[in-house]
């Protein structure tokens, strides 16, 4: 009588090349926002395309800041943050807030902003829309955190405006084809 069959070992998965992963992930078009928080008496801001709606009941959204970013620390400290949805004319704004290494005080002085009535955070005056959020939960996401916020204020400022999109490593508008910078 033959003995029991040896266990079948699952195949070893080859490592995924980070460049290949980025190329694939970059084929998912996203909107572009600027996320802001105020902590230690200073405004903090960064461009994000990792922003999405999560739930309607309760009203929840999320974004994913890099754990080493100043905004990450500010959001954790303040517990309140804002989102300014960028229009297709805001590519310069997006690039400005995406630049690493700038002093915090230089980030918002160049753009017209107002304070959110519920959070006191800076929100861009000419954003398509703004949201004010209170941190609901923070989850580990590798080198980023997944910050879930309860939406406590919204303002649809320019409903006719067209959104700024990010796709395949570049900015797009609804009418601009890939490669049509």
Residue ranges of predicted features:
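Basic, polyanion-binding surface patches
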Residues: 1-181
């Amino acid at each position: 009588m033959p003995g029991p069959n040896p266990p079948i070992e699952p195949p070893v998965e080859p490592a995924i090349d980070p460049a290949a992963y980025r190329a694939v992930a970059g084929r998912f078009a996203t909107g572009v926002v600027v996320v802001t928080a105020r902590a230690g008496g200073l405004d903090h801001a960064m461009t994000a395309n990792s922003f999405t709606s999560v739930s309607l009941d309760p009203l929840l959204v999320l974004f994913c800041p890099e754990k080493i970013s100043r905004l990450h620390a500010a959001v954790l400290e303040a517990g309140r943050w804002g989102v300014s949805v960028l229009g297709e004319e805001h590519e310069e704004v997006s690039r400005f807030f995406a630049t690493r290494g700038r002093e915090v005080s230089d980030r918002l002085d160049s753009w017209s902003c107002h304070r959110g009535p519920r959070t006191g955070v800076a929100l861009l005056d000419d954003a398509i829309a703004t949201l004010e959020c209170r941190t609901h939960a923070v989850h580990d996401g590798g080198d980023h955190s997944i910050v879930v916020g309860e939406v406590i204020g919204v303002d649809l400022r320019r409903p006719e405006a067209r959104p700024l999109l990010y796709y395949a490593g570049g900015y797009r508008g609804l009418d601009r084809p890939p490669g049509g910078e």
